[in-house]
Amino acid sequence: ITRRMVAEYMLDELQDWRLITSEISSVTDFRTQRRMRFGGYGVLPVVAQGDSYTPLTSPTDQEATFSVSKRGGLETITLEMLANDDVGALRRIPQRLGRAAGETLYRAVFDPLNDNAALTYDDDTTAIFTSGHANSRTLALNAANFDTVIQDMMAQTAYGNSREYLRLRPMFILHVRALWRTVDQLVTQEAQAEPFTTDRNINAFRKYGIRPIQVDYWTSTTKYILVANPRVIPTIEVGFFNGNEDPELFVADQENGGGSTQFNADQISYKIRFIFGVLAPIDHRSFAQGNT
């Protein structure tokens, strides 16, 4: 039963969150987890012949927080329900619970980006996408505007050091259903769908290998967000309790120690439990929103 549940939870379409996540961690308690972000030293000064080395300016730091929480619930079926189940729907309850767990985690990662949630740093609790972060636009998706948003990401500098450019490039584009065709034309087709330059309409974006990720449950018709390479800059952290990345399924019946409830009534109870937490994002510089 557990294997069937986990197989449904691991369906490919529910695993896109892993692509944009930079850290999957093991959390051993329910206390607040603290994550530090440090600035850089920038450009080192020249030391002339015979001169002493001067102290560098120490990088500043920020602290972000998150915690894991339990998610889950109970489902109970009776002997009569099971006997009358002509189409086997009740026997698929474990798979459906696995699907629910997968959907829960999927949305926990993508919801903060959709909702433009507030950051959790000690000195920055503004929204992810703001003019102050230089990562927020309201531009319809086309070649010229796509180029503008990419340049927004390229222009990001390190925390605490405006002279240190992070050299970010988009690796993914998150988008709503309504933009699937436009996104396909921009990032996968050899020729552009609209005039943009004088280079015989060749699609200059294609060489960057930007991968589209369609988020079907987002209700906007215009939203698209660029995501940098999670191996280059921290994006999102997902922490699992004791490193257990799979939901847990428990079955209570007479054979499995169901207790008086199962003894007094002919029924079987399922309990699903899933413990995790999400820090999204770790660094707002890793995301650039083109439209809401």
Regions found by a protein language model. Name each.
Residues 1-71:
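Assembly/oligomerization interface modules of large self-assembling protein complexes
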Residues 13-14, 102-105, 109, 121, ...:
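Residue-level signal for secondary-structure boundary elements
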Residues 31-37, 57, 113-120, 216-221, ...:
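Noncatalytic linker/hinge segments flanking ATPase motor cores
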Residues 61, 65, 80-91, 163, ...:
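Short, charged/polar micro-motifs that form catalytic or ligand-binding hotspots
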Residues 73, 77-92, 96-157:
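Alpha-helical scaffold segments that mediate packing/assembly in large oligomeric complexes
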Residues 131-140, 144, 148-158, 171-172, ...:
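Sequence/fold signature of self-assembling virion shell proteins
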Residues 166-170:
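Short gly/pro-enriched beta-turn/loop segments at secondary-structure junctions
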